[in-house]
Amino acid sequence: MKRILLIATGGTIASAEEGNGLSPALSGEELARSVPQIEGLYELDIVQPMNIDSTNMRPADWLRIAEVVREGYDAHDGFVVMHGTDTMAYTAAALSYLIQGSPKPIILTGSQQPMGNPFTDAKINLYQSLVSVSYTHLTLP
């Protein structure tokens, strides 16, 4: 069974209605429990270095995410970073420089609708990210 590190950073995927808009509110554990189809498929460890709207993601946060990956690198077969979509591409680019040459897959995922929305894409996005990260033969050299 693959051991995967799920890194929760916030974003729409972790958001709930608060006041006059969405705000990151759900923990990584709550997000994983929202997708019962993953139970028993992976040995899943969850860390949450931050829970922010991705418009507030800064270079120091990229360094923290990279540090979390490095800290868990030897113990895990792959990594899924749950992230807001506004700045996901910037974080992915930063991580590609901060963690070069990794034979272990690192996938970033998010959603357009929060996990609690009945029309959310969050559940399938998280599920497919975990499926993809477990297929190491898809990793590019």
Q: Where in this protein do the model-derived segments appear?
A:
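N-terminal glycine-rich anion-binding loop in soluble enzyme alpha/beta folds
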Residues: 2-73
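Short glycine/serine/threonine-rich phosphate/pyrophosphate-binding segments
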Residues: 15, 87-92, 125-126
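Acidic, glycine-rich active-site loops and adjacent beta-strand->loop/helix elements
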Residues: 52, 85-87, 110-115
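Short acidic/histidine-rich motifs immediately flanking catalytic phosphotransfer sites
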Residues: 75-77
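Short Gly/Thr/Asp-enriched flexible loops that form oxyanion-binding sites at enzyme active sites
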Residues: 82-104
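Active-site glycine-rich loop that binds ribose-phosphate moieties when present
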Residues: 122-133
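Conserved small/polar residues in nucleotide/adenosyl-binding loops
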Residues: 136-141
